[in-house]
Structure formats: C-alpha cells, structure tokens
C-alpha cells in the first residue's frame, strides 16, 4: 500500500507542471486534440511475470488527458492446487494523465488508470469458470518520446493495486496481482497546439 501511495503522489505532483511548444523527432506537434493506441504491460507480482495487452484513448486538454482504457492478461497463470486452475485478470475504466513539458522531444509522462474488472478462474478438469469482481488502481510515471507529430511512445514504471479478490471464492491470494511493473504506451492522434506558434 505504501508503494501505491508513493506512485499516486508522484502522479498528482506532476499535475502542477505546464508545457509550452512542441518538439518532435520528425516534425512539429500540437497540444490539444485526441489520441488512441495500444498498451503493453509487464507486471512482476509474486515472482511471476504477467503480461497484459489492451488499449486506450483520450481527449487532450493542454498537457493533460482524460479518457478510458481496457486491459487483459495474455499469459494466464496456472495455480497447482488440489484442483489445478487457470487465473486471468481483465479490467477497464477511466484513464487520466499528463505530459510535462509535452513540447519537448523527450518529456515526463504520468498517468493513472482507475477501473473495474474481474479475476477469471477456470478449472483444468471440468472447465468450470468463476468470476470475482475487482477494483484496479494503477499509477505510472516515466518518459515519452515524440516520434512524429501524430505518434508518441511512452515507457513507464507502474504499480498495480487490485482490490476485491476473495480467496474463499477464487483460491487466489488477495495480493496476487499487486506489484510493480513496466508499460509501453503507443499514442496515435492529434496533439495540436492551437494557441502558440512556432518561431521561424
């Protein structure tokens, strides 16, 4: 929980920063618009590398954005119990964040995913499925590179906190999905700058 609080505090503190003009590797980019794109996530909880893929999109206002996301694990974990079973996590919800200063070629990127979903359990022998609803909070912080004015890549460190797992129902420890990780976020869209002009 202390790790989660630390990451969330870092995210909130970044909201006090403001950007100005845009710099990109191959062109000039804007600051107000919208974007969408895929997200790849690696988490290292319980000595187990968990890979999730998904995507998100948002409206950009200044250096901040507000939108939604969806994620799901791609490598289900097999838990060897009395009755072996496969466990997966899927979740989606709100996505808020910012880039500071976004006009720079390389700049700070911070966001938080606030969502709901379920831990899915499938037993090996009879294919029985159990769903346990959960709440997910995942702050992240890192750097982003402006490739083109319409394309950016962010590499971040995150902490995923999953609340609501009931071990009595799922047989999964309530902290099974909690832990640090790393994200790659690919953002495609219009990052417009409507109030500032570039100097010749």
PLM feature spans:
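Bacterial Sec-dependent N-terminal signal peptides
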Residues: 1-23
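Short glycine/proline- and aromatic-enriched beta-strand/turn motifs that initiate or cap beta-hairpins
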Residues: 19-69, 187-200
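Transmembrane beta-barrel outer-membrane domains
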Residues: 29-31, 46-50, 85-91, 128-136, ...
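Outer-envelope beta-barrel architecture signal
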Residues: 30-34, 62-64, 104-110, 149-153, ...
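Transmembrane beta-barrel strands of outer-membrane/channel proteins
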Residues: 34-42, 59, 68-72, 110-116, ...
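Outer-membrane beta-barrel proteins
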Residues: 47, 77-80, 119-125, 164-168, ...
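Gram-negative (and chloroplast) outer-membrane scaffold detector with strong preference
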Residues: 63-137, 145-147, 185-188
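Predominantly the C-terminal beta-signal and adjacent terminal strand-loop region
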Residues: 146-200
């Amino acid at each position: 929980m202390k790790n989660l609080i630390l990451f969330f505090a870092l995210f909130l503190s970044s909201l006090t920063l403001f950007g100005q003009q845009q710099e990109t590797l191959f062109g000039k980019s804007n600051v107000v618009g919208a974007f969408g794109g895929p997200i790849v996530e690696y988490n290292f909880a319980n000595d187990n590398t968990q890979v999730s893929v998904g995507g998100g999109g948002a409206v950009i206002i200044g250096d901040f954005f507000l939108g939604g996301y969806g994620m799901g694990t791609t490598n289900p974990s097999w838990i060897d119990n009395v009755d072996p079973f496969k466990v997966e996590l899927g979740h989606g919800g709100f996505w808020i964040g910012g880039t500071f200063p976004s006009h720079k070629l390389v700049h700070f990127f911070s966001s938080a995913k606030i969502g709901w979903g379920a831990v899915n359990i499938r037993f090996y022998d009879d294919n029985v499925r159990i769903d346990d609803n959960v709440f997910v909070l995942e702050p992240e912080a890192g750097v982003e590179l402006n490739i083109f004015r319409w394309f950016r890549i962010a590499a971040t460190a995150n902490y995923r906190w999953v609340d609501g797992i009931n071990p009595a129902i799922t047989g999964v420890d309530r902290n099974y999905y909690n832990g640090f990780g790393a994200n790659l976020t690919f953002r495609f869209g219009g990052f417009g700058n409507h109030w500032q002009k570039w100097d010749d």
